[in-house]
């Protein structure tokens, strides 16, 4: 009877393998998004710890019993002059960017022709000015933008002229 009515549970709705109560996905190894994120973080931490142990093992030089002449480290220090100081750039908060965005949002957009407030429903023409729904057409507001030459340039860029080499007659 279950075959007739197809009352089987779909394979995509499986519970998480960790039994956390959420649904898992086959794309995330039958884990829910929370458990999968935790798994990814653990893998990244393990890989970073492996890298640090490899780097530390490479930086330690093997002890040499017969050669007492080598007293300097294998890798010379990058900075031998102590009077030169390294400048570490500090994180500075960029305040000018949000203020310009706020100024643009606070400034009311008005139609250039009738000075009607348009807000978000305004239309910006290719000539660079803002218009309302009535004056948005180039014929109505006397647009100075040359649509024909712009169209020709776009077509020329999209379809470059392909010139084949001439065939020589035998």
Curated annotation (Swiss-Prot):
Residues where Zn(2+) 2 binds: 111, 114, 132, 135
SUPFAM superfamilies xrefs: AN1-like Zinc finger (SSF118310), Glucocorticoid receptor-like (DNA-binding domain) (SSF57716)
Protein name: Zinc finger A20 and AN1 domain-containing stress-associated protein 6
Free-text function comment from the UniProt entry: May be involved in environmental stress response.
PANTHER family: AN1-TYPE ZINC FINGER PROTEIN, ZINC FINGER A20 AND AN1 DOMAIN-CONTAINING STRESS-ASSOCIATED PROTEIN 6
Zinc fingers, A20-type class: 10-44
Cysteines joined through disulfide linkages: none
Taxonomic lineage from the root: Eukaryota, Viridiplantae, Streptophyta, Embryophyta, Tracheophyta
Gene Ontology terms for molecular function: DNA binding; zinc ion binding
UniProt-annotated stretches for the region Disordered: 53-76
Binding site for Zn(2+) 3: 125, 127, 141, 143
Zinc fingers (AN1-type), renumbered ranges: 105-151
Residues where Zn(2+) 1 binds: 16, 20, 32, 35
Alphabetic keyword roster: Metal-binding, Zinc, Zinc-finger
GO biological process terms on file: cellular response to hypoxia
Source organism per UniProt: Arabidopsis thaliana
InterPro entries xrefs: AN1-like_Znf, AN1_A20_ZnFinger, Znf_A20, Znf_AN1
Keyword tRNA processing found: no
Pfam families: zf-A20, zf-AN1
């Amino acid at each position: 009877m279950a075959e007739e009515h197809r009352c089987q549970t779909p394979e995509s709705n499986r519970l998480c393998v960790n039994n956390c109560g959420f649904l898992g996905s086959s794309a995330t190894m039958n884990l829910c998004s929370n458990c999968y994120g935790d798994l990814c973080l653990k893998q990244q931490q393990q890989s970073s710890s492996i890298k640090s142990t490899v780097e530390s093992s490479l930086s330690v030089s093997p002890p040499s019993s017969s050669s007492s002449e080598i007293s300097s480290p294998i890798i010379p220090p990058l900075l031998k002059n102590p009077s030169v100081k390294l400048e570490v750039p500090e994180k500075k908060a960029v305040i000018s960017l949000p203020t310009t965005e706020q100024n643009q949002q606070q400034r009311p957009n008005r139609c250039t022709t009738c000075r009607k407030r348009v807000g978000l429903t305004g239309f910006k023409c290719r000539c660079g000015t803002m218009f309302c729904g009535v004056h948005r057409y180039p014929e109505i507001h006397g647009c100075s933008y040359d649509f024909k030459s712009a169209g020709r340039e776009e077509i020329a860029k999209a379809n470059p002229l392909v010139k084949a080499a001439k065939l020589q007659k035998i």
